[in-house]
UniProtKB/Swiss-Prot annotation:
UniProtKB keywords: Metal-binding, Ribonucleoprotein, Ribosomal protein, RNA-binding, rRNA-binding, Zinc
Cellular component aspect of the GO annotation: cytosolic small ribosomal subunit
Name of the protein in question: Small ribosomal subunit protein uS14
Pfam families assigned to the protein according to its UniProt record, in alphabetical order: Ribosomal_S14 (PF00253)
Provenance organism: Aeropyrum pernix (strain ATCC 700893 / DSM 11879 / JCM 9820 / NBRC 100138 / K1)
GO biological process terms held by the UniProt record: cytoplasmic translation
GO molecular function: rRNA binding; structural constituent of ribosome; zinc ion binding
Amino acid sequence: MAKIRPPKPKRMGRGAQRCQRCGTRDAVIQKYGLYLCRQCFREIAPTLGFRKNR
């Protein structure tokens, strides 16, 4: 039987960055070194000092 190697960790592309809070790989905000997904950013943004521009 053949040996199965574990997959290599991704280093480039959309799947390489993960949200530090929930671990999802969709819509990760990397600006300012945040590495949060869109949903987590909306929950945490007021505590970080971000405001809505309206």
